[in-house]
Swiss-Prot record:
Function: Required for the insertion and/or proper folding and/or complex formation of integral membrane proteins into the membrane. Involved in integration of membrane proteins that insert both dependently and independently of the Sec translocase complex, as well as at least some lipoproteins.
Compositionally biased tracts (Polar residues): 269-278
A single GO BP: protein insertion into membrane
Pfam family of the protein (one): 60KD_IMP
Bilayer topology: Multi-pass membrane protein
InterPro entries: YidC/ALB3/OXA1/COX18 (IPR001708), YidC/Oxa/ALB_C (IPR028055), YidC/YidC1/YidC2_Firmicutes (IPR023060), YidC_ALB_C (IPR047196)
Protein name per the record: Membrane protein insertase YidC 1
Gene: yidC1
Family to which the UniProt record says this protein belongs: Belongs to the OXA1/ALB3/YidC family. Type 2 subfamily.
Taxonomic path: Bacteria, Bacillati, Bacillota, Bacilli, Lactobacillales
Region (Disordered): 263-308
Membrane-spanning intervals of the chain: 60-80, 135-155, 168-188, 211-225, 230-252
GO MF terms held by the record: membrane insertase activity
Length: 308
């Protein structure tokens, strides 16, 4: 199970890097971005950055901030929807803690591979019985829809004409900036900490805790080898993600918690068929034994009456 989680985390990181660089092609001779995503989304973003920077005289740093905020606001509903699904899953796990916790305890205390497999099957069966997805309720579609925007603005912040020679608050945008790297790491760490808010299920908390360090570490590593213009985009993105997390924690989660509790009040959850320590229902008959003994006693008395 642990090896699967490690593989999933590594695959997620590799996939993010692949998508960020793969959505937009780069011409090998000129080093400039090309392709459908760039022409459709990236180039207009670059023009918007240039418009705010030169036509409005705001400078490239402020222009990158403005365009990043606009793009983030456009895709915010997708991010909220993605978080809504994950939060709904989390609240179901919290509400059904009394059903799932025994299986999770068995899984932790299992010593043999057979016991672990049996405990996993019991846990998956209990989750399936109560409509809880084993994948955390997070669909791929909202993430895939957002990725072209992330990729396009990543290249727009880096390749917009004039940005490499500009500076923002004394920071050259064409070379890496340790100040912005530190800011990006702190912001993504805070966002990861906020994602723990309201999560009561122990297994979920453990999974989120692993990601708390993964996401900031990835951003820091990428930022160390990226120009400050790109890191500035990630800093603004970190602020927007914290805003999104506040919306989820204090608006979305309370509503979903109320909804889940109302549904459970109308349809109280039944104990799982795999809730006994052995992983099976206890079907040992009790009453028939007493009936059998009465029948035997009656037959014994009947025999005595015949002998008389």
């Amino acid at each position: 199970m642990k090896s699967i989680k490690r593989f999933a985390l590594s695959a997620m990181g590799a996939a993010m890097l692949l998508v960020l660089t793969g959505c937009v092609n780069v011409d090998k001779t000129t080093g400039q971005p090309t392709g459908f995503i760039w022409n459709t989304i990236g180039a207009p973003m670059a023009e918007a950055i240039k418009y705010f920077a030169t036509d409005k005289g705001l400078g490239f740093g402020v222009a990158i901030i403005i365009v990043t905020i606009i793009v983030r606001l456009i895709i915010l509903p997708l991010g909220i929807y993605q978080s809504w699904k994950a939060t709904l899953h989390s609240e179901k796990m919290n509400a059904l803690k009394h059903v799932l916790e025994p299986h999770q305890t068995r899984l932790k205390e299992a010593t043999t591979q057979e016991e672990k497999l049996e405990a996993q099957q019991a846990l998956f069966a209990a989750q399936k019985e109560h409509g809880i997805s084993m994948f955390g309720g997070v669909g791929c579609f909202p993430i895939l829809l957002q990725m072209p925007f992330f990729s396009a603005i990543y290249f727009a912040a880096q390749h917009t004409e004039g940005v490499a020679q500009a500076s923002y608050l004394g920071i050259p945008l064409g070379s890496p900036s340790m100040i912005l790297v530190a800011c990006a790491g702190v912001l993504y760490y805070l966002q990861s900490l906020l994602s723990l808010h309201g999560v009561e299920d122990e297994m979920q908390r453990e999974q989120i805790k692993k990601m708390i360090y993964m996401s900031p570490l990835m951003i820091v590593v990428f930022s160390l080898f990226s120009p400050a213009s790109v890191t500035l985009y990630w800093v603004v993105g970190g602020f927007m993600m914290i805003l999104q997390q506040f919306i989820v924690n204090y608006i979305v989660r309370p509503k979903l918690r109320k909804k889940v509790h109302e549904e459970l009040a109308k349809n109280p959850s039944k104990a799982s068929a795999f809730s006994t320590p052995s992983g099976r229902k206890d079907v040992t008959p009790e009453q028939p034994t007493a009936i059998t003994s009465k029948k035997k006693h009656k037959n014994r008395n009947a025999g005595k009456q015949r002998s008389r």
